[in-house]
Amino acid sequence: MLLTIDVRNTSIELGLFAGSGTHARLERHWRIHTNPLLTADELAMQLRGLIGGPLEQVIGVAALSTVPPVLRELRTMLARYWSHVPHVVVEPGVRTGIPLLVDNPKEIGADRIVNALAAHQRFGGPAIVVDFGTATTVDLVSAKGEFLGGVIAPGVAISGEALIEKAGLRRVELARPRSVVGKNTVEAIQSGAVFGFAGLVDGLIDRIRDEFDAFAGDDVTVVATGISAPLIVPESETIDQHEPHLTLTGLLRVYERNQQRRRT
């Protein structure tokens, strides 16, 4: 099986894939809290506990991290505990197969690149990829599979934290309120989070369609992923598909591309 590791600021998503290519399937997956102080040894222990059984079942590892301290420990862990299997960490210089048509390709986060690859292989192009993570990103993928750039906005959770810290409002459960107009503070905050971010994304996608002719037609797929996607997607008028494990699938594809390159 292939182990995939997606480290973000808020959480770490892990998945085990069986098979390859079009026959690959996600057998098991987990999400754990991100600790920026996590050491390589601690991360290895967590993985062993989650995977269970013989570690020999893992024949390869593909990973990314948008958290620099964890990225360093991730590299150390792979070298220390998984050196016997092929592994790929998505960072500048790693072959992804996605041309980055932007001013500075090194600025583009590995998560955005991997999502673009997965979306293009799954749905073709053109596509718009929305990731509801710590940040909310809206990225464009051309019909040729090129990354054309995108939009970065605050994430749902981080916006809520800002309200708590700066406005003195209390922490509330993120859930769909009864109405867009809240009758109390809790529902008002929930409305801003759920309907506000649905409107944000819908507005951005409408503007993208207006500005770029290649994204104005019915052949464009708008796909969403990310930890807050289940909350926002049902309220969106523009999102076509929800792929909860898009990033893990993208890591699988990057791994396969790099393995093919080693064999040629």
UniProtKB/Swiss-Prot annotation:
Active site (record annotation): D111
Compartment(s): Cytoplasm
Matches recorded under SUPFAM superfamilies: Actin-like ATPase domain (SSF53067)
Cofactors demanded by this protein: NH4(+); K(+)
GO annotation, cellular component aspect: cytoplasm
Entry's Gene Ontology molecular function annotations: ATP binding; metal ion binding; pantothenate kinase activity
Catalytic activity: (R)-pantothenate + ATP = (R)-4'-phosphopantothenate + ADP + H(+)
Annotated positions binding K(+): D131
Co-factor note (free text): A monovalent cation. Ammonium or potassium.
Pathways involved: Cofactor biosynthesis; coenzyme A biosynthesis; CoA from (R)-pantothenate: step 1/5
Name listed for the protein in its UniProt record: Type III pantothenate kinase
Species whose genome carries this gene: Nocardia farcinica (strain IFM 10152)
